[in-house]
């Protein structure tokens, strides 16, 4: 059997019991090397197969083949495996190859939920996730989604906001949003949510400093009703108070 699990943003406290139990029961754990380090408390003397960045297909294929061979295998993703994780790729590979292998999907806490809880309550109304990584999605497509989300006044959670190879993508996203959102729109940033180097801060669309943002960051841009009170970012649900 192959269990594809989300381990949350990094803290053991943010892992689900189902994910922990799957790790404890597994014979073999497969994952990106950084993520396998985050769950080492549960892997003990189990066989751990680590791969680097941009090896997602190889990682999933290895996990599938081990499960086919009769092993109890866990494939880990950070956050939730079904949100920019390995769940979809595993199902695609199994389907395309017409394999008879049992796949179990175990949810985890995605970064936007963890970040929102640290910032206040910014996701109380409609929101969307947009990844700024153009490795698998053409940048013009991403730009169209940013514009549409801004015009629809969604609260927007930006994943993969900035890296050494994509230093300008987040700034470009904010430029696009400036056409539909006020410069005073609250923005919250959380780095390394649930990990030792966790940081968070609030700013605005117009005052955003992009330099500290990296791939461990989650950026939340509010909607027209979002405000900051006592250092907390709040998007009203719409109750009459």
Regions found by a protein language model. Name each.
Residues 71-77, 121-132, 150, 206-214:
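A polyampholytic, Gly/Pro-enriched intrinsically disordered region
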Residues 7-14, 137-139, 200-203:
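Short gly/ser/thr-rich secondary-structure transition/capping motifs
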Residues 1-103, 109, 114, 209:
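Class I S-adenosyl-L-methionine
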Residues 80-81, 133-136, 161-164:
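Short histidine/acidic/glycine/proline-rich micro-motifs that form metal-
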Residues 42, 86-87, 115-117, 140-142, ...:
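Short, well-ordered secondary-structure micro-motifs
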Residues 85-152:
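Class I SAM-dependent methyltransferase SAM-binding "motif I" and its flanking Rossmann-like core
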Residues 2, 73, 151-241:
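A contiguous loop/helix-start segment that scaffolds small-molecule binding in enzyme catalytic cores
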């Amino acid at each position: 059997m192959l269990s594809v699990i989300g381990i949350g943003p990094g803290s053991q406290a943010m892992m689900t019991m189902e994910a922990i139990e799957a790790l404890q029961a597994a014979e073999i754990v497969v994952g990106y090397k950084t993520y396998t380090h985050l769950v080492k408390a549960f892997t003990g003397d189990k066989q751990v197969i680590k791969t680097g960045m941009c090896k997602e297909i190889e990682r999933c294929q290895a996990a599938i083949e081990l499960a086919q061979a009769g092993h109890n295998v866990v494939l880990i993703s950070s956050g939730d495996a079904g949100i920019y994780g390995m769940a979809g790729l595993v199902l695609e590979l199994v389907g395309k190859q017409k394999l008879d292998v049992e796949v179990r999907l175990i949810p985890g806490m995605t970064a936007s939920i963890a970040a929102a809880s640290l910032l206040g309550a910014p996701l109380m109304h409609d929101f969307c996730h947009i990844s700024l990584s153009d490795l698998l999605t053409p940048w013009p497509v991403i730009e169209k989604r940013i514009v549409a989300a801004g015009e629809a006044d969604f609260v927007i959670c930006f994943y993969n906001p900035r890296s050494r190879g994509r230093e300008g993508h987040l700034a470009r996203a904010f430029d696009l949003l400036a056409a539909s959102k006020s410069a005073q729109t609250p923005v919250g940033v959380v780095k390394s949510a649930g990990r030792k180097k966790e940081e968070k801060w609030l700013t605005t669309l117009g005052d955003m400093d992009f330099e500290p943002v990296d791939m461990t960051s989650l950026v939340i841009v509010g909607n027209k009703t979002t405000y900051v009170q006592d250092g907390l970012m709040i998007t009203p649900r719409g109750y009459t108070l």
